[in-house]
Amino acid sequence: MPSVRTKNLLHFHFIVFLFSFTSILGALIQLSAIPLVAHRMLWATGFIGIYILIRRPGDFFISKENIQWLMAGGIFIAFHWMSFFYAVKVAGVSLTLSMLSMGAFFTALLEPLFFERKIILYELVFGALAILGLVLIFQSEWDQLWGMLVALVSTILGVFFTLVNGKLATRVPAAAVSFYELGFGACITWGVVLFNPRMLDQALHLVSQDVMLLGILSLVCTAYAFVGSVHVMKILSPYSVMITINMEPVYGIVLSVLIFGEKELLNISFYLGVMIILAAVLGNGYFKIRSDAKQSS
């Protein structure tokens, strides 16, 4: 019988697979980065709001202290996604996904400060291994400095967002966390759109294909995946979440090969990089399970 941690890890791997579709959908949707994120966050907020209204209306009521954390999470996720999709537009799917690998290393450094615990050496080692794996996968694509910088900023924002959710996961129901963070983020992104006539015109004139793709992105890859990712953080640490997210580029590259053909090439370095990332992800899981076993014995 799988342990609670194992079940949550497997569930999160499925969520990461769904996350890997976001870069593909972002490349297919004709909207520019900020209008795309504005629609994504607004639609997902609506979907989650309907779910809460039907299933658990009481989840709408949140304490003032938690509202402040939710606002911070909304700010981080809004700017994380805007910079992420902008990086996809200017630098491509592969380079943007590759920069996500640095998230685990940054989390290994920042989580101890955020949660007032000691730095764990193996987390730094596995975080560095994940970076090495992605460098091998994309060794021929590191000449786009601007795209790299934007993607790096997006990664750091994503780390802070994950740390905030680590605080909220045990305090607030997952659906409520998702509803308020996405809602605050939607206010920020639509505020930017409303003050830019070109973006506003683009956001208000969607083609039918974009409506369909936005529906998939918002309902499946955002509303469901977002709530699920917050829920698993009741058990998984922010670091475990970030190290597992390193599988997103692997899933994303395989999908992009199938969808975009020759735009994304697989070679020996790709497979070697994948093996290193897998070793880091599995190694972290092993040490976390062993640590849990020691604490319970």
Description of each model-found segment:
Residues 1-38, 44, 75, 79, ...:
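Glycine-/small-residue-enriched transmembrane alpha-helix faces in small-molecule transporters
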Residues 7-14, 35-51, 68, 123-128, ...:
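Hydrophobic alpha-helical transmembrane segments of multi-pass integral membrane proteins
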Residues 31-79, 106-107, 157-164, 179-197, ...:
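Transmembrane alpha-helices of multi-pass small-molecule transport proteins
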Residues 41, 210, 246-297:
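C-terminal-most transmembrane helix of multi-pass membrane proteins
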Residues 48, 71, 119-138, 189, ...:
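Hydrophobic transmembrane alpha-helices of multi-pass small-molecule transport proteins
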Residues 50-52, 103-125, 250-270:
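C-terminal transmembrane-helix exit sites in multi-pass transporters
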Residues 55-94, 100, 136, 218-236:
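Specific transmembrane alpha-helical segments of multi-pass solute transporters/efflux pumps
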Residues 96-102, 165-186, 222-258:
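Helix-helix packing/entry segments at the starts of transmembrane helices
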